[in-house]
Amino acid sequence: MALYIIFLLIASSFILFSFIFSQKPKGKLPPGPPKLPIIGNIHQTVGGLPHYVFRDLAKKYGPIMHLQLGQVSIMVVSSPRLAEEVLKTNDIVVANRPYSLVGDIVLYGSSDVAFGSYGDYWRQMKKIMTVEVLSAKKVAAISGTRQQEVNNLMEYIRSTCGKPFHVREHVMQRNNNIICKSLFGDNCKQQHVLIESLDEMMKLSTGFNVSDLFPNWGFLPVISGYKSTLTRIHKNIDSILSEIFEERKIKRQKGGASDEDMLDVLLNIKERGGLEFPVADNNIKAIFVNMFVGGTDTSVATIEWAMTELMRNPKVMSKAQAEVRQLFKGKNTILDKDLQDLVYLKYIIKETLRLHPVVPILLPRECRGPCKIGGYDIPMNTVLFVNAFACSTDPEYWDDAESFKPERFENSSLDLNGRACEYLPFGAGRRMCPGITFGMSVVEIILAQLLYYFNWELPNGLSPNDIDLTPNFGAVADKKVPLQIVPTLNSLK
């Protein structure tokens, strides 16, 4: 008991000392809500979905606002005009990521592309991912793997026609298979365990972890068990990946190198050498964790949200099915190359990503130096958040912004590449997601086949208005209530 009291006294003194002597940012800062001692504005950001909370606060305090979350000073941008100042005008200045214990422990010292600090090493690895791993050519090269898993999904649905189909569960299973086979071929014996560990990591990455909000208090992740949990997750992931790597190296020694999958591609790059920063196994592992995290939940959530909106909007569903069925009339198999002319389906996907962005708040950026945004002074080391959801539903830029209208993309130059900041499904600038082509290849082929081969109804007499549209609280904003729909087989005549 005495030791406990002593600990409390020491901790209280440390907290008070930190509060009294903490430096306040200088200059003309953006407005924001009043702060409490020590916790700042933390109490105003809990209790709701962050992209909704930030949007509602922005209505009161403006399109750029200052929040103090514990010891971390953040700015939240909620308008396309100011998002452009962040992601384009000041892109190089705000190209860093803030420190994350998850990145440090699980992602091999943040040596990955998603969470790594901006610099020469990061630029090299981003180029490798963009050119060697995730280019359109490489994505096309694994179309056979993608097609096989999608065919398996369609066969499963055929075998269960008339029964409720759990969209997320079954699409997730096939999508995970696509990613594993794309990375490792068929060599992923512990795929289920690997996915479970990655899911646990994602859950721990959700929201604002107290350890990241009070980085000066190094004891927090220790006494809370957060650090030990992350270490356990890292060991699980590393053990599985190390086994895969060792088996592949033995195979390569016997039969030579190839370009069959992404592991071979990256091992070839490692063995060729000649890079400014030699690529180690751990660097490749970090990229693979990025691929899993960025390619699993996001694609599946997009498919589920798209099917949700199609079920809620029967006229849109009918128009989409008519397009697919007219284009593929009589075909028993649909290939990637057949998707080029599905114009209306692409509008549906764009509108889904506008109204239901799977990453509604872009990954945070950190200022490498001071800059100005919206006429305000943004100090060095400030963390910046862009509320992509607020931008893509801003009524100044979008007519009837809360409604699902794929036709709004007719004669529109907006694309998925972040050229206009009112539409940022994958971010923009240097930190834009490099996996757009890979992810969209899965989304398009699955949606096209779901619409071509099957008709869909809601179970148990539900009406379209009964569908719950509440997003989940998580790193990916999928549906809180998973979508279940009933398929019946469409005649291909």
UniProtKB/Swiss-Prot annotation:
Pfam families: p450. Probably involved in the biosynthesis of germacrene-derived sesquiterpene lactones. The keyword 4Fe-4S does not apply. PANTHER family: CYTOCHROME P450 (PTHR47955:SF13), CYTOCHROME P450 FAMILY 71 PROTEIN (PTHR47955). GO terms for molecular function: heme binding; iron ion binding; monooxygenase activity; oxidoreductase activity, acting on paired donors, with incorporation or reduction of molecular oxygen. GO terms for biological process: sesquiterpene biosynthetic process; terpenoid biosynthetic process. Glycans are attached at residues 209, 411. It comes from the Eukaryota. InterPro entries: Cyt_P450, Cyt_P450_CS, Cyt_P450_E_grp-I, Cyt_P450_sf. Keywords: Glycoprotein, Heme, Iron, Membrane, Metal-binding, Monooxygenase, Oxidoreductase, Signal-anchor, Transmembrane, Transmembrane helix. Heme binds at residue 433. Its cofactor is heme. Pathway: Secondary metabolite biosynthesis; terpenoid biosynthesis. This is Cytochrome P450 Tp9025. It is a single-pass type II membrane protein. The keyword Metal-binding applies. PROSITE patterns: CYTOCHROME_P450. GO terms for cellular component: membrane. It comes from Tanacetum parthenium. The chain crosses the membrane at residues 1-21. It is found in: Membrane. The lineage of its organism: Eukaryota, Viridiplantae, Streptophyta, Embryophyta, Tracheophyta.
